[in-house]
Regions:
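Catalytic cores of nucleic-acid ligases and guanylyltransferases
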Residues: 1-194
Length: 194
């Protein structure tokens, strides 16, 4: 029969991997640049978790007053800007969404199936800090989730196999991105030779 998948919101923000040991937190980009001092909101989110040692995968994104995502350039400027971080934070606050749990208090979770890592993440993180995620085997439910997220201003969805181990730094075959297709039907009105 149909296989259950996680239908995750595709966020157009800054992908982050966050390492915490006690009160010390380090935030890295996908290319392993450390941006800890530029994203205090991410640090605070992770310090709020009931864990001593944790490694998480997530996304930091700027939302507008209505909770809709800002263009990527707005989010991206947070790590590039030379402005004082308190000013930036007031101008463009970031929201942290966590989508995977890779290590927890001495236990590496990388080889566990995604379903188990996601369940443990949901037990650890407050509900508003986990990426919007629907687990379903029903294509119609997945379609409705996709439509709702696109209507809310997001890029689309990422479908994730629930039996897959973690693949660092790249989307494996276990992840499929789905975005709306924007097509144009055009009629040729004028042809100029020459």
């Amino acid at each position: 029969g149909p296989v259950e998948v996680a239908v995750d919101c595709k966020l157009d923000g800054i992908r982050v991997q966050v390492h915490r040991s006690g009160d010390e937190v380090h935030v890295f980009t996908r290319s392993l640049d450390e941006i800890t001092d530029r994203v205090p909101e991410v640090v605070e989110t992770v310090l709020g978790l009931a864990a001593e040692q944790v490694v998480l995968d997530g996304e930091a994104i700027a939302l507008d007053d209505r909770g809709r995502p800002q263009p990527f350039q707005v989010t991206g400027a947070r790590t590039a800007s030379r402005k004082d971080v308190a000013t930036l934070r007031a101008e463009v606050p970031l929201t942290t969404y966590l989508f995977d749990l890779l290590h927890l208090d001495g236990e590496d979770l990388l080889d566990l199936p995604a379903r188990e890592r996601f369940t443990r993440l949901e037990a650890l993180a407050p509900v508003g800090s986990v990426v919007p995620r629907t687990v379903t085997a029903d294509p119609e439910t997945a379609r409705r989730t996709f439509d709702a997220l696109v209507a809310a201003g997001h890029e689309g969805v990422v479908l994730k196999a629930l039996d897959a181990a973690y693949e660092a730094g790249r989307r494996g075959a276990a992840w499929v991105k789905v975005k709306p297709r924007h097509t144009l039907d055009l009629v040729v009105l004028v042809v100029e030779w020459g």
